[in-house]
Swiss-Prot record:
Its main location: cytoplasm. One of its GO terms (cellular component) is cytosol. The gene is tsaB. SUPFAM superfamilies: Actin-like ATPase domain (SSF53067). It comes from the Bacteria. InterPro entries: ATPase_NBD, Gcp-like_dom, T6A_TsaB. It is found in: Cytoplasm. Disulfide bonds: none annotated. Coiled coil: none annotated. The keyword Chaperone does not apply. It comes from Buchnera aphidicola subsp. Schizaphis graminum (strain Sg). PANTHER family: TRNA N6-ADENOSINE THREONYLCARBAMOYLTRANSFERASE, TRNA THREONYLCARBAMOYLADENOSINE BIOSYNTHESIS PROTEIN TSAB. This is tRNA threonylcarbamoyladenosine biosynthesis protein TsaB.
Length: 210
């Protein structure tokens, strides 16, 4: 595939940008806190320069559509929509929780991922993700906003071994169990958006337009 993809994530406290070009991914990630608006555009410019391309070379834009922090999500959506309109190219919105699951696969090659992302007081965004034999993730239908005191009951019902990722696990008390293994993956990375745009035959696959 010769198409060029720009991926953006500003859904939580970290900002990240990635460009896919000729089977190479150029990426940049920074801690943004409340500075998403200030940092994300210079980051995009820097990654484009590293890839030796301009905005006009892009064929697709993908972004993290949440769940996450409202302001950060709106920034990603706004940038993606602006580029789509000005360049007349399609955009793809990918779940933040599925991006975290993909990051766990990239780093640890694990297929059963429990994602918990910090939400409102006493709540987390929850998702149960499974990577199937076609190398695609299932689990977006399990995503929900859940009270922390309800999570232990959900975990007791799960079978097999699960990997825990996301910053929401800092808040969750749980029993020690061989079924669960926590990994130090707190934030999504835009480079993990790229695989969602490919199907088995390596053609771009529209998951959702915003």
């Amino acid at each position: 595939m010769s198409d060029i993809i720009l991926a953006i994530d500003t859904s939580i406290d970290h900002c990240s940008v990635a460009v896919y070009k000729k089977k190479v991914i150029y990426s940049l990630s920074e801690n943004c806190k409340k500075e998403h608006t200030i940092k994300i555009l210079p980051m995009i410019k820097k990654v484009l320069m590293n890839a030796k391309i301009t905005l006009k070379d892009l064929n697709y834009v993908a972004f993290s559509k949440g769940p996450g922090k409202f302001t950060g999500i709106r920034i990603s959506i706004g940038i993606a929509q602006s580029l789509s309109l000005s360049l007349k190219i399609p955009i793809f919105g990918i779940s933040t929780l599925s991006i975290l699951a993909q990051k766990a696969w990239r780093k640890y090659k694990k297929k059963q991922i429990l994602v918990a992302v910090n939400a409102k007081i006493g709540q987390v965004y929850w998702g149960e993700y499974l990577r199937n034999n076609t190398l695609l993730w299932t689990g977006e239908k399990t995503e929900s906003l859940i009270k922390i005191n309800k999570i232990e009951d959900k975990m007791k019902k799960l079978k097999k071994k699960w990997i825990l990722v996301g910053d929401g696990w800092k808040k969750i008390k749980r029993e020690n169990s061989l079924k669960f293994e926590q990994k130090k993956i707190l934030y999504p990375n835009a480079k993990d958006i790229i695989p969602f745009l490919f199907s088995e035959n390596s053609k771009p696959r529209i998951l959702s337009f915003f």
